[in-house]
C-alpha cells in the first residue's frame, strides 16, 4: 500500500512538472508522437526529395550522364549550403538532409544520386554517426557505409569525392565536443583518407582548412561550433570545386 501511495505521489509530481513546462502537454505529446511516427514511416527520408528528383529525371536523357551535374549528398552541413550562391552557373544538386547518418544516406544513394545521372558526387557524412543520431555506431560501420556508396558510384561510373568530417568547437552556445569527440573526428578522417588513397578516390580535406591552433573549428567560420557560416562555406567552396575537377579528370 505504501508503494502504491509513493507511485501515485510521484505521478502527481511528474504531471505537475509537465503541465508547468507546457501550456498544453497533451498537444505537445501528440506532436512528438506524430514526429516519431513520421520518422518511422520514412526512416531514410526518401520522400524529402522525391518530387524534385522526379522533375529532374523527367528532363534528363534516357541514358548517359547529365553534363556538369554534381550531386552533393550529406547532412545539415550540406542541407544548409546554398550551392547556387557558391557555385554560380553550375548544375549542382543539393541532396543534404539535416541530422542524417551514413546508413540513411546509403539507402538514399540510388534515388537521390544514381538516378539523377550525375557526372560526379560529393559525400560529406559522418558527424551524426559519431553523435549516435540513429543509434550507436562504430568508426568501422561508418567506413563500411561510405565504402558501399563508393562501390555503387564506381559501378555507375560516377566520379566520387568523399569529404572529411569538419572539426567542431566549444566556442558557441553549446559544447559540441561532448557529442562530437574531436579525437573520433580525427580517427574517422584518417580512415576516410586511407580508404580514398587505397581505392583511387579524391579525398576532400575540409578539416585542416577550418581548424584553429587549439584543434577546434575556427570561431570565425561558425556560429554554433558545428555548422559553417557564410565565411566557412566560402572556404569550403573552392576546395570542393578543385576536388570535383580532380575526380572528373581521373575518369576521363
PLM regions: where:
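Hydrophobic residues at beta-strand termini and immediately following loops
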Residues: 73, 95, 204-206
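Catalytic nucleophile-elbow at a beta strand-turn-alpha helix junction centered on a G-D-S/GDSL motif
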Residues: 67-83, 98-101
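N-terminal secretory targeting modules
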Residues: 1-71, 83, 245-252
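Cell-envelope and extracellular/periplasmic
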Residues: 96-98, 125-126
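Alpha-helical cap/lid subdomain in secreted, periplasmic
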Residues: 85-91, 106-252
Amino acid at each position: 500500500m505504501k508503494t502504491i501511495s509513493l507511485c501515485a505521489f510521484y505521478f502527481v509530481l511528474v504531471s505537475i512538472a509537465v503541465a508547468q513546462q507546457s501550456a498544453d502537454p497533451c498537444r505537445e505529446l501528440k506532436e512528438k508522437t506524430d514526429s516519431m511516427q513520421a520518422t518511422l514511416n520514412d526512416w531514410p527520408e526518401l520522400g524529402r526529395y522525391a518530387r524534385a528528383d522526379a522533375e529532374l529525371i523527367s528532363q534528363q536523357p534516357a541514358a548517359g550522364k547529365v553534363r556538369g551535374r554534381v550531386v552533393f549528398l550529406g547532412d545539415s552541413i550540406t542541407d544548409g549550403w546554398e550551392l547556387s550562391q557558391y557555385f554560380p552557373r553550375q548544375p549542382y544538386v543539393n541532396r543534404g538532409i539535416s541530422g542524417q547518418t551514413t546508413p540513411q544516406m546509403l539507402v538514399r544513394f540510388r534515388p537521390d544520386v544514381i538516378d539523377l545521372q550525375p557526372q560526379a558526387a560529393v559525400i560529406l557524412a559522418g558527424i551524426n554517426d559519431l553523435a549516435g543520431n540513429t543509434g550507436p555506431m562504430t568508426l568501422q560501420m561508418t567506413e563500411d557505409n561510405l565504402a558501399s556508396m563508393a562501390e555503387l558510384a564506381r559501378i555507375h561510373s560516377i566520379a566520387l569525392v568523399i569529404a572529411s568530417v569538419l572539426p567542431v568547437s566549444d566556442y558557441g552556445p553549446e559544447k559540441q565536443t561532448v557529442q562530437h569527440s574531436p579525437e573520433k573526428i580525427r580517427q574517422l578522417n584518417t580512415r576516410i583518407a586511407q580508404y580514398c588513397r587505397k581505392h583511387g578516390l579524391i579525398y576532400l580535406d575540409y578539416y585542416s582548412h577550418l581548424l584553429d591552433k587549439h584543434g577546434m573549428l575556427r570561431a570565425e567560420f561558425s556560429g554554433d561550433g558545428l555548422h559553417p557560416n557564410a565565411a566557412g562555406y566560402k572556404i569550403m567552396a573552392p576546395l570542393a570545386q578543385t576536388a570535383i575537377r580532380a575526380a572528373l579528370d581521373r575518369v576521363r
